[in-house]
């Protein structure tokens, strides 16, 4: 595993600028405008989270509750897949379920049955959004085929560096700074509450494109800044931020994108609007997406 982000496939192959991201989505942008696509970003993340966490309470009892890191990895797989493919190429509900299945393996979570994800999808979609999940088959082979396609489209780059790790390292640095610095008025209080709010913001950031644009440490620092502002405690960071060595132009951009996502999410009536967005979703091709033109090395890229 590539412990060094800067040498990883995540850094070298899966960080883009905003203009490039929208260019790669050109086929889907013939159907959706930018605001609609951003609403879809929120929906897909919510859907993947729901499939992973809510099915356990269903009458079919086929649910599964996954660790947040597994969910985050699955969401990023999904985002990466649809940078290289359009919704017409492969059913996004199937891709989302497959991304969860693959993320369980990569994050060394207990591997759940394929049928659990398919059944959870069929239960959660109509229950929460009034949308029916349709597929030509519910046999395990369907998901195993889609897993192969997903791995190939991702160039076998399956290790994802999340914002949580650098974020908690930065929070520890903040704690030490406020305890030792003569500049800070007093040690920071309610650290557990701050950590929880920061983690929530980091999780929520998966509902926009920051994971495709910024390194994890930028998202981590941005999550801290947004979380503290939401708690009404932003001024407590001022002295510490002066000491942080990073590209604050990128941090400012990331913070703005997270706030824009929250503004859009607040106005997003999912129960009503998702049906309209799904009505525009093109029917997937019968054939699987075209394979990459170049040859892939065997094994997973780290």
Swiss-Prot record:
Pfam families hit by this protein: Cyclin_N (PF00134)
Listed SUPFAM superfamilies: Cyclin-like
UniProt keywords, alphabetically: Activator, Cyclin, Developmental protein, Nucleus, Transcription, Transcription regulation
SMART domains recorded: CYCLIN
Keyword Nucleotide-binding annotated: no
Compositional bias annotation for Low complexity: 292-302
GO molecular function terms listed in the Swiss-Prot or TrEMBL record: cyclin-dependent protein serine/threonine kinase regulator activity
Example of a GO cellular component annotation carried by this entry: nucleus
InterPro entries according to UniProt: Cyclin-like_dom (IPR013763), Cyclin-like_sf (IPR036915), Cyclin/Ssn8 (IPR043198), Cyclin_N (IPR006671)
SUBUNIT field: Component of the Mediator complex.
Family: Belongs to the cyclin family. Cyclin C subfamily.
Function: Component of the Mediator complex, a coactivator involved in regulated gene transcription of nearly all RNA polymerase II-dependent genes. Mediator functions as a bridge to convey information from gene-specific regulatory proteins to the basal RNA polymerase II transcription machinery. Mediator is recruited to promoters by direct interactions with regulatory proteins and serves as a scaffold for the assembly of a functional preinitiation complex with RNA polymerase II and the general transcription factors.
Record protein name field: Cyclin-C
Species whose genome carries this gene: Caenorhabditis elegans
Gene: cic-1
């Amino acid at each position: 595993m590539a412990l060094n982000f800067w040498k990883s496939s995540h850094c070298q192959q899966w960080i883009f600028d905003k203009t490039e991201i929208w260019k790669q989505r050109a086929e889907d942008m013939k159907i959706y405008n930018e605001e609609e696509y951003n609403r879809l970003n929120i929906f897909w993340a919510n859907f993947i989270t729901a499939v992973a966490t809510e099915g356990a309470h269903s009458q079919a009892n086929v649910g599964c509750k996954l660790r947040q890191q597994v969910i985050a990895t699955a969401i990023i797989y999904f985002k990466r897949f649809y940078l290289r493919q359009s919704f017409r190429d492969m059913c996004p509900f199937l891709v989302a379920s497959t991304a969860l299945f693959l993320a369980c393996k990569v994050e060394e979570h207990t591997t759940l049955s394929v049928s659990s994800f398919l059944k959870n999808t069929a239960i959660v979609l109509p229950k929460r959004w009034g949308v029916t999940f349709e597929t030509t088959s519910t046999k395990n082979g369907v998901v195993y085929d889609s897993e192969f396609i997903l791995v190939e489209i991702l160039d076998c780059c399956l290790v994802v560096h999340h914002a949580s790790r650098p974020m908690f390292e930065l929070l520890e640095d903040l704690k030490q700074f406020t305890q030792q610095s003569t500049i800070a008025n007093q040690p920071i209080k309610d650290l557990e509450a701050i950590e929880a709010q920061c983690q929530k913001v980091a999780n929520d950031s998966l509902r926009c494109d920051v994971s495709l644009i910024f390194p994890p440490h930028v998202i981590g620092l941005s999550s801290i800044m947004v979380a503290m502002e939401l708690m009404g405690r932003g001024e407590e960071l001022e002295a510490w931020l002066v000491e942080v060595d990073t590209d604050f132009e990128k941090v400012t951009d990331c913070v703005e994108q997270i706030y824009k996502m929250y503004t859009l999410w607040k106005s997003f009536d999912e129960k009503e609007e998702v049906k309209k967005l799904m009505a525009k979703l093109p029917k997937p091709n019968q054939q699987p997406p075209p394979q990459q033109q170049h040859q892939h090395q065997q094994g997973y890229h780290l």
